[in-house]
């Protein structure tokens, strides 16, 4: 009986240790790409509404997704080991990103701030104001891409 409980404790401890390790670099790249891809798709929905038939509800919904994704802590997915291709996951991140954590934090903060402002402006339904804020929000994406994304 003691052996059983000792084995049970060992399994529990090992399981806890494995769970605390978090996702593997390959999985982090995959999740990161999915998150930014979903954000880009929602940016596209906003742009389509601004360029075509405007639907305030669609713009608000897409802006909320962008803001939620931007504020979700995706910066944690730029962890050690995710600076290069891993397994079948390719990354376009430049190695410099991992050497400038303060700049990355600043850029992610800018994205989150402008995306939250986009949500507020979208709620007004003012197309001109939404276009202006959409440009500011997209500019934060561009700033990061210019610094840290391979072409």
Please place each PLM-identified region on the residue numbering.
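Sec-dependent N-terminal signal peptides
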Residues: 4-13
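N-terminal signal peptide c-region/cleavage motif recognized by signal peptidases
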Residues: 14-19
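Sequence context surrounding c-type heme c attachment/ligation sites in exported
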Residues: 22, 26-60, 64-151
């Amino acid at each position: 009986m003691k052996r059983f409980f000792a084995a049970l404790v060992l399994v529990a401890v090992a399981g806890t240790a494995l769970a605390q390790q978090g996702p593997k670099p390959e999985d982090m790249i995959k999740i990161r790409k999915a998150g930014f891809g979903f954000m880009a798709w929602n940016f596209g929905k906003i742009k389509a509404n601004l360029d075509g038939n405007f639907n305030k509800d669609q713009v608000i919904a897409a802006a909320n997704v962008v803001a939620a994704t931007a504020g979700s802590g995706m910066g944690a997915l730029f962890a050690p080991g995710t600076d290069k291709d891993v397994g079948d996951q390719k990354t376009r991140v430049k190695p410099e990103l991992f050497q400038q954590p303060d700049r990355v934090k600043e850029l992610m903060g800018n994205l989150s701030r402008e995306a939250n402002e986009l949500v507020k402006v979208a709620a007004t339904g003012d197309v001109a104001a939404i276009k202006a804020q959409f440009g500011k929000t997209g500019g934060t994406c561009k700033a990061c891409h210019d610094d840290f994304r391979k072409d």
